[in-house]
Amino acid sequence: TTNYILTRMIRAGLSFAAALKEAQENGYAEQDPTADIEGHDACRKICILASLAFGRHVYPDQVPTQGITGVTLADVAYAESCGKKIKLLGRAIHRPDGRVCAFVAPHLVDLEDPLSGVEDVFNAITVRGNAIGDVMFYGRGAGKLPTASAVVADVIDAAKHMKTKKYLGWGPGGAEVAVPPAEVESV
């Protein structure tokens, strides 16, 4: 949803409000788009991904989150003048001290960065590995068909594993994992 809105602001010069309205009319944004445009959906996703990647519970209330509602056409023009695009990014970093730094916010992304080419209804995840470097997974992320596909895949996965005795739960903990906003470093 946010990629679609930002793409329409960049390519068509639409205001945030006009791009959001268009996204809603096309079925890419909910009637109440708060979770998407305020970054809450991205925050939940980065919590899940960070927890899976780093084996630590990361909770939404531990992740500094800022959405795109404050992004203006002047911001878009400034980014373009610097050879960059504005993207809403969720980031999770496993620090050498074992803590996880996670945050969600609009970022200026270099045009040479593959993430700058992720536009419209597409999403991407970049994973950095010690041996392989950066790997980007890219695909549709907004609209009824990608959403329906993800839900069906989750239902099938749950049905396949109904008889297993392995349970994944969100127990207590996590407070020592996330880095407070004052400690977030530039990456």
Located regions from the model:
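Short acidic, glycine/serine/threonine-rich loops at helix termini
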Residues: L6-I10, D75, G139, S149
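A conserved regulatory-domain signal marking ACT and ACT-like small-molecule sensing domains
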Residues: A150, V155-V187
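Oxidoreductase and adenylate-handling cofactor-binding alpha/beta cores
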Residues: T2-G13, R44-V58, D154
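Substrate-binding/catalytic subdomain of NAD(P)-dependent oxidoreductase enzymes
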Residues: A18-G117, F122-A124
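Internal, active-site/partner-interface "lid" segment
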Residues: T1-N3, L20-E22, N26, T164, ...
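C-terminal transmembrane helices and immediately adjacent loops/tails
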Residues: G129, V135-F137, A158
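Catalytic-loop motifs flanking and including active-site residues across diverse enzymes
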Residues: T1, A42, T147-A150
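Glycine-rich phosphate/pyrophosphate-binding beta-alpha loops
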Residues: G133-V135, G139-L145
